[in-house]
Regions:
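Post-Walker A alpha-helix
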Residues: 17-18, 257
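Conserved nucleotide-sensing/catalytic segment adjacent to the nucleotide-binding pocket
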Residues: 24-73
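The conserved Walker
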Residues: 10, 248
Length: 278
């Protein structure tokens, strides 16, 4: 049986992710207490090959039992994987304001929305380290659905490299394992003919390809990864998120992510995410 445990902060997009899993053939269960997971799996094991269960702070402190539950499930032959969705405080508060919904912890925590978000983040901190983290702060629902479907294709027995572009003016991705700053490189934004384009467009690629510093920057990151990937593998990582940032996340970071993904794609599992492209 394939089991995906979907957890994360309220407002981070779990409903969207759960629907994406359902659309790909998973039997989904929303907001199941962690203490009931093993019993549910035992009940439906014979009839369902792919199951996705959403778990969040509404289940209370029983979520602390999740790490041990995962170990038991894996030992019993269940292929258990964890996705953890998160976002920064400002993005979460904005989403609750837009939907005019109270935070699930509002009746238990005083101090307003931000206090509730921080308490939930504390409650789920250990769970965040169990699986693949996705920062949805500046990600729209369609992009998140794409991320989930790409992640499902990953062979969990091998380390996956997730190359992610972003703009520093929108904040550093909180799910990044490694962050590289490409703002020191020439910026196509200042060429009026390139300003509206992205790092995927041929004219921008030609502009950046012509600069030796860009090539050295990419070579240095690639060399670092080649040198240290064996250590990350020995650390039993399921995925390694390498975030490349420029000012707006439109030109330089996008180009570098595409170049790195192409270099490593023939030998490694590669995921590409452009966080700040529309």
């Amino acid at each position: 049986m394939q089991l995906i445990l979907l957890s994360g902060l309220s407002g981070s997009g779990k409903s969207v992710a759960l629907k994406a899993l359902e659309d790909t053939g998973y039997f989904v269960v929303d907001n199941l207490p962690a203490s009931l997971i093993a019993a549910l799996i035992e009940t439906i094991r014979a009839s369902s090959e792919k199951v996705a269960i959403s778990i969040d702070a509404r289940t209370g402190e029983t979520i602390a039992t999740l790490p041990n539950t995962i170990k038991q499930l894996n030992a019993s032959g269940v292929d258990c994987r964890v996705i953890f969705l998160e976002a920064n405080d400002e993005a979460l508060a904005r989403r609750f304001s837009e939907t005019r919904r109270p935070h699930p912890l509002a009746d238990k925590i005083s101090g307003g929305m931000i206090a509730c978000i921080k308490e939930e983040r504390r409650m789920l901190a250990d769970i965040a380290e169990l699986g693949h983290r996705m920062d949805t702060s500046d990600v729209n629902p369609n992009a998140l659905r794409g991320w989930i479907k790409d992640w499902l294709k990953v062979d969990r027995s091998r380390l996956a490299l997730a190359f992610q572009s972003f703009g520093f003016k929108h904040g550093i991705p909180i799910d990044a394992d490694l962050v590289f700053d490409a703002r020191i490189l020439p910026n196509p934004y200042y060429d009026p003919l390139l300003r509206s384009l992205t790092g995927k467009d041929d004219k921008v690629k030609a502009f950046l390809h012509a600069d030796l510093n860009v090539a050295h920057f990419i070579d240095d990151i690639a060399s670092f990864l080649v040198r240290w990937l064996p250590s990350f593998v020995r650390d039993n990582r399921a995925a390694l998120t390498i975030a490349i940032g420029c000012t707006g996340g439109q030109h330089r970071s996008v180009y570098i992510v595409e170049e790195l993904a192409q270099r490593f794609g023939s030998e490694q599992q590669v995921l590409i995410r452009h966080r700040d492209l529309g």
